[in-house]
Amino acid sequence: MSEANAGTNAKTDVVLVGAGIMSATLGTLIKLLEPNWSITMIERLDGAAAESSDPWNNAGTGHSALCELNYTPALPDGTIDISKAVNVNEQFQVSRQFWAHAVENGVLPDVRSFLNPVPHVSFVYGADNVQYLKARYNALVTNPLFASMEFIDDKDEFTRRLPLMAEKRDFSEPVALNWSQHGTDVDFGSLSRQLIGFAAGNGMTTMFGHDVRDLSKNSDGSWTVKVRNRRTGNNFKINAKFVFVGAGGGALPLLQKSGIPEAKGFGGFPVGGAFLRTNKQHLTSRHNAKVYGLPPLGAPPMSVPHLDTRVINGRQWLLFGPFAGWSPKFLKQGKVTDLPLSVKPNNLASMLGVGLTEVGLLKYLIGQLLLSEPARVETLREFAPSAVDSDWELDIAGQRVQVIRRKGAGGVLEFGTTVLAAADGSIAGLLGASPGASTAVPAMLDVLQRCFADRYQAWTPKLKEMVPSLGTKLSDEPKLFEEVWSWGTKVLKLDVQANTAEAANAPATV
C-alpha cells in the first residue's frame, strides 16, 4: 500500500504500530501463519528499532533470569523464592526456540549480528550477601533450566574469570559469583530489522516517518487508523480488521485514544536511563561477561547495576549502569507533554496513588539526577576498582514507561510487561518494560491466542514447529529441555565463540 492510494478506503487486515521488537515479532508470526494476510507497519521514526529496541537504548541481556538478582528474592526465613526466575527463563526459552526455527528456515539470515555467547554472572561482596548467593545457587541448580550454574567464592578463580574486576580489588572482603556459562548478548535492533525484512519481503507494507494520530472503532468491529506523514504533513486513514500497538512508551496514549475499557485506569511512569560505555581494547579484552550486582537499598528493580559485554555491529563494548534519569517523555524522541497528556479522569487516582506511595523511588531518582560524572565512575569502581574516568563516556539510553495499574482507590507501580487486549480481540497493545524484549515471542503468542481465539487451535501445529515446547513447562520436562536446548545451541551457533569476544575461561593475567 503506497501513501498515494492510502485514502479513506485503504484497507488492510493488520496494522502494526511501531517498528520495534514486538511488532517485528508479531508481523513475522502472522506472515508465517497466514501468508496471504495484508499487514501494514507504521513507524513514526525514519528507521526500524530506533527506540527501546536499539542496542544503545537497552541492556541487551536477553533477560533469562540467570543473573538478575531481583528475580530471586530472599524470604524472611532465609529461603530463596525462585518462581519469578523460573517463569522469566521459561519465557526466554520460547523466544530462543523461535529464533532457532527462524534461523533454520531463512527468516533470520545473520544470527551472529544479533546473538552472541556471553556468560551471565551474579556478583556480590560482603559475608551476608555471599551467604545469600550460595542459597540462591542451591535453590536454582536443582532446576533443569539452571542446572549448569556454578558457585564461585575463590579469589583465584574470580581473578581468572573476571580479570578486569579483580584488578586492584581488596579481597579481604568476601566475594562470590553465580556463573552461567551459556548466557547470551542480544542486539534487539538487528533482530528486529531482520524480522521486518522477512515480513516486508513477503508482502508487508512499511511506512516509516508516519505518525498514528488517532484510532476509532467502526460499527463492523474494524478500526479506522488516522495517520500523518511527518515529512509532508499529509493526513490519511487506513481501515484495519486488527490493530497491534507495539509503540513502546507511545503505546499508552494510543490505547487511551482507542477508548477500550481494558485501558482505563492504567497510567505510565517514565524513567530514563544512562550507561557508561567504553570500547578500549585493554578493557574489553579483560571482561567477557554480563555481571549483575545487588540494587542499592530502596532502589527499584530496574536499577540493578551491571557491567556488561556488548557486541554491537561486530564490535565489543563494555557498558555499566543503569543510571536513572527523569523526563516526562514516553519515548527518547517523544514530547515533554507525553506524561501530562496521559493523565485522564479514569487514571488520575492511580497516578496520584503511586506518587504518594513510591517515596523510595522518588528519592532514588533525585539522588541519581544529582550524580556527577566522577560519582558515576566511582559507582563503577564497585565492579571494576581500577576504572579510570577518561576511559569511559556517557550513553543516554531509552525511556522506560513503567505500568501504573489501578489498585483499590489508588494505584500501584508495576515492573514488568503487560499485554492489553480488547474483549473482542480487535486491538491489543503492550505496556511496560523488563523483562521486555527477550519475552517478545511468548508475549506475541499471548496476543495471537487472545485476539484470534477462533483460529489459534488451527495454528497450533504450525506454532509447535516454530516453538517445539509450546504449552509445556520445560522446567518440568528435563529431557525435552535438553533436546530443544541442544538444537537451539547448534542452530544459533552458540557453541562457537564469537570472534569479537574473548574466550570466557581463557587464562588471564592481572
From Swiss-Prot:
EC number: 1.1.5.4
Pfam (any one): Mqo
Top-rank taxon, per record: Bacteria
Enzyme class name: oxidoreductase
UniProt entry keywords in alphabetical sequence: FAD, Flavoprotein, Oxidoreductase, Tricarboxylic acid cycle
Cofactor: FAD
Gene Ontology biological-process entries: tricarboxylic acid cycle
Record-linked SUPFAM superfamilies: FAD/NAD(P)-binding domain
Stored InterPro entries: FAD/NAD-bd_sf, MQO
One of the record's GO molecular function terms: L-malate dehydrogenase (quinone) activity
Pathways per UniProt: Carbohydrate metabolism; tricarboxylic acid cycle; oxaloacetate from (S)-malate (quinone route): step 1/1
Catalytic activity: (S)-malate + a quinone = a quinol + oxaloacetate
Membership in a protein family: Belongs to the MQO family.
Protein name per UniProt: Probable malate:quinone oxidoreductase
Organism lineage: Bacteria, Bacillati, Actinomycetota, Actinomycetes, Mycobacteriales
Gene: mqo
